[in-house]
Every structure is written in C-alpha cells, then in structure tokens.
C-alpha cells in the first residue's frame, strides 16, 4: 500500500500548485520577497512607516460552502473568504498587506481547488494585498470526497496615531450604511433550512425579476477595502467603522462605538432587498431573528461627523456602491445599557 492508495495524491497536489502559481504571484506587492515553495512567506513592511501596528484577522465562509459545493460555485467562495477577513481588518483604518489561506478536503479536485484559489487571488488583487502562501490538506476519511473547508488569515498595517478605534465618535455623528451584495457569508445555516423547507433548487426563481434564487444567494461578499482606502486618501475623517456579519447590525454596529454612546438607526432609511423578505416569508423567520442573523442590505457602516456625510456619499458613489445615512450616535442612558436603538419592536 502507498500514500495514493490511502487517499492522498501527492502528484495531484504538485500539479495543483503549478496550476495556481501565476494567479498567486500576480497578487504580489513590491514588498514580497521570493515566490511559492518556501516554508514561510516573506514580506517587508511598506517604507515610510514610523510607528506601525500590525492588525490580524481570521475567518471562514461557514456553511455557505455546502451550498456552493452543491452548485459548483467555487470561485465565489474564494472571494467570500477574502471579504470576510479583509472587511474586518480595515475597520481599524489598516492597509491589508498579505493573506494566507487554508484548504482542507477529502480528496483533492485540482479544478475545483484551482477555482477557489483563483477567487482568493482575485479578492486579494482587489484588496491590494498579496496572497503570500497557503496550505492545502488532503484528509481522506475525515472529509467526504468533494467536500472542503476554508479558512483565511489577513495581516494589515496602520500607523499607531492614525488607527481608527472609535475613540473619536461623539454624539451627533452620523452612521452611513454601505450596501451589501446580498446575504454575504453568514446566516447560511438558517438559509439552508429555508431552502430545504421550500424544496428550492437551481431552477427556482424569486422576486419581481424572476431571479435565480441559488445564484442570488451565492453572490460573493462585497469587498470594502478600496472604498476605505479611497476615503482615507481623500482625507475624509472616519471616526468608526463596522463590518456587518453574524449578528447583523444589532451585534456589530455597537462594537465600533464607546460604551457611553448608543447607535440609533432608522430602518426606513434604506430599502430592504427582496431576498431577505423572501427568506423571512418562506421560513417564517421572526423579525427579531432576521435582524440578529442577516445584514439586511447593509454590509458595512461608517461613523463620521455630520459635515462630511456628503463627501462620504460621493466617494461611495464613485465606487459604484450604494450608501445611505441610516442613523446617528447619541448619549447612552446608563439605566438601560442599550447599545443600539431603532429596531422594529
């Protein structure tokens, strides 16, 4: 018996590395030293930094992977993986430097895995960070054939005196909501239950435009890194930022705000995408659970002074991203301890 008989194809792994090499190396920034094949990726810090802080984040794509694997949507989950990590680290005003991926699978499918990595590489390219390395683990008997899991790791850098940590947020500041592309990459355990309940498949259409339901659900996560970079380069003072993922607005927006303040949102200030209404109706999801599970059309939030709202909206428009003033910051009531107000009762 040999390793291949046991379920691990080393030759297929080598062929896979050669297949993805050009996509990976196309993401490399000038600071990257060397190419694929080393025990660790090497990268210099960008020149001109005085007191750099490194910002690190890690995440996955959750059970969206199961739906993607069922429908061979491998490229999109690569973009999702980058979005889940990069959108977190940029909330501190940091510039993404490099990304690492981990792929675990039951049996290596070079074509499917190449599509995943090409999606990761494209996400890195759009975010300005290098895909510095990764690991692909073939684990027969642990994962079913055709099944894989993903994890991503992003490291970014910010000058210590330019770090955005919410300390500048004050009463009267405005909250700008930036549109999501859909469900993004959280809440899919609930999504999959709704799909099973309705017996939806790849031919199921929904909404007034008769959109393909599965394709819409698998739309990749919006990458907000270029937007934040453009705002910072335009010297727009950002007081706080929040990536709206698991827990929705109620559990993510308050994370960027000091505890003596409360965020107050107006749900009527943006139109909830019809996909979320379909999920609620089809799954009979209570309104409270909907708000605490999904982004409901707002994937990222910016907290700014009232006088720069128009500047922020202009930069969002230049990025072809819809954005709306969705609320404001107020002084919190010590007696209630609430961090967010305005949700439907």
From Swiss-Prot:
EC number(s) on file: 6.3.3.1
**InterPro entries given in the database record:** PurM-like_C_dom (IPR010918), PurM-like_C_sf (IPR036676), PurM-like_N (IPR016188), PurM-like_N_sf (IPR036921), PurM_cligase (IPR004733)
Cellular localisation = Cytoplasm
Query: What processes does the entry annotate via GO biological process terms?
Result: 'de novo' IMP biosynthetic process; adenine biosynthetic process
Q: In which pathway does it act?
A: Purine metabolism; IMP biosynthesis via de novo pathway; 5-amino-1-(5-phospho-D-ribosyl)imidazole from N(2)-formyl-N(1)-(5-phospho-D-ribosyl)glycinamide: step 2/2
Which keywords fit this entry according to its UniProt record?
ATP-binding, Cytoplasm, Ligase, Nucleotide-binding, Purine biosynthesis
Q: Which GO terms describe its molecular function?
A: ATP binding; phosphoribosylamine-glycine ligase activity; phosphoribosylformylglycinamidine cyclo-ligase activity
Q: What HAMAP family does the record tag this protein with?
A: AIRS
Instruction: Report what the protein is called.
Output: Phosphoribosylformylglycinamidine cyclo-ligase
Q: Which organism is it from?
A: Prochlorococcus marinus (strain MIT 9313)
């Amino acid at each position: 018996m040999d390793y291949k008989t046991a379920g691990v194809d080393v030759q297929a792994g080598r062929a896979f590395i050669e297949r993805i090499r050009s996509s990976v190396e196309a993401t490399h920034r000038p600071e990257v030293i060397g190419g694929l094949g080393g025990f660790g990726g090497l990268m210099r810090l960008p020149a001109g930094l005085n007191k750099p802080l490194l910002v690190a984040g890690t995440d996955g794509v959750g059970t969206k992977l199961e739906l993607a694997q069922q429908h061979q949507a491998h490229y999109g989950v690569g973009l999702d993986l980058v979005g889940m990590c990069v959108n977190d680290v940029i909330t501190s005003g940091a510039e993404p430097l490099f990304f690492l991926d981990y792929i675990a699978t039951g049996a290596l499918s070079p074509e499917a895995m190449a599509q995943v990595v090409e999606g990761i590489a494209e996400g890195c390219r759009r975010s300005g960070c290098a895909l510095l390395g990764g690991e692909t683990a073939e684990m027969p008997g642990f994962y079913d054939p055709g099944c894989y899991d993903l994890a991503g790791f992003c490291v970014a850098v910010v000058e210590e005196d330019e770090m955005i940590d919410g300390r500048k947020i004050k009463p009267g500041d405005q909250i700008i909501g930036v549109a999501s592309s859909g469900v993004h990459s959280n809440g899919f355990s609930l999504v999959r239950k709704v799909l099973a309940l309705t017996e939806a498949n790849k031919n199921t259409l929904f909404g007034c435009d008769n959109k393909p339901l599965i394709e819409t659900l698998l739309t990749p996560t919006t990458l907000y890194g270029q937007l934040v970079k453009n705002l910072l380069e335009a010297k727009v003072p950002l007081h706080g930022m929040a990536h709206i993922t698991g827990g929705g607005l109620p559990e993510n927006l308050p994370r960027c705000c000091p505890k003596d303040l409360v965020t107050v949102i107006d749900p009527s200030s943006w139109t909830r995408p019809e996909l979320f209404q379909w999920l609620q109706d089809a799954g009979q999801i209570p309104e409270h659970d909907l708000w605490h599970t999904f982004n409901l059309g707002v994937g990222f939030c910016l907290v700014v002074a009232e006088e720069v709202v128009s500047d922020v909206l202009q930069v969002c428009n230049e990025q072809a991203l819809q954005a709306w003033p969705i609320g404001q910051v107020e002084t919190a009531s010590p007696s209630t301890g609430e961090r967010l107000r305005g949700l439907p009762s």
